UniProtKB/Swiss-Prot annotation:
Binding-site residues for ATP, renumbered to this chain: S9, S10, M11, N12, A13, G14, K15, S16, D87, E88, A89, Q90
Pfam families: TK
Cellular compartments per GO CC: cytosol
Name of the protein this chain belongs to: Thymidine kinase
Organism: Colwellia psychrerythraea (strain 34H / ATCC BAA-681) (Vibrio psychroerythus)
Amino acid sequence: MAQLYFYYSSMNAGKSTHLLQSSYNYQERGLVTAIYTAKIDDRFAKGKVASRLGIDADAFLFDEKINLFKDVDQKHQAEKIDCVLIDEAQFLSTEQVKQLTDIVDLLHIPVLAYGIRTDFLGQTFSGSAALLAWADKLVELKTICHCGRKANFVIRQDANGKAVQNGEQVEVGGNERYEPLCRAHFKQLVWL
């Protein structure tokens, strides 16, 4: 039975690596996957999901305008799709998460979504909030804070490495801008 999975974490926990491994596992068995990633994420080449380990795969791009159910249904009619994988799922709209549930419930295709739970201020992304509410399975991928504790949060840093305490929720960046932290260190830097 197909299900909607949400793999969530802070940054640098290996979400993209896990997605690429899952896709490979399907493909190794002769099954077809459809990988999607956010158009807004320009850290790597457009139309690619890439891991810091150096592996990557081609991906379809999504933005706020795409109807994921219709897009997957069209692709599925042309070639049977056995699994849909979504990278950067925090950037999905609530409506797009509903579309993912339709892919599972109506097309009977499993969907594996990977994303960050909270932003640099500790607020939930709308896509992540909807996935936390509606996914059949929730899986936390763990990373660690510099102190060795589990990192549940992420801070955004300015050019001087100082924690930013305001700004737009979405600002794409990598290790040079964001750092995963445990709650205690996050509170010290952001909630002052």
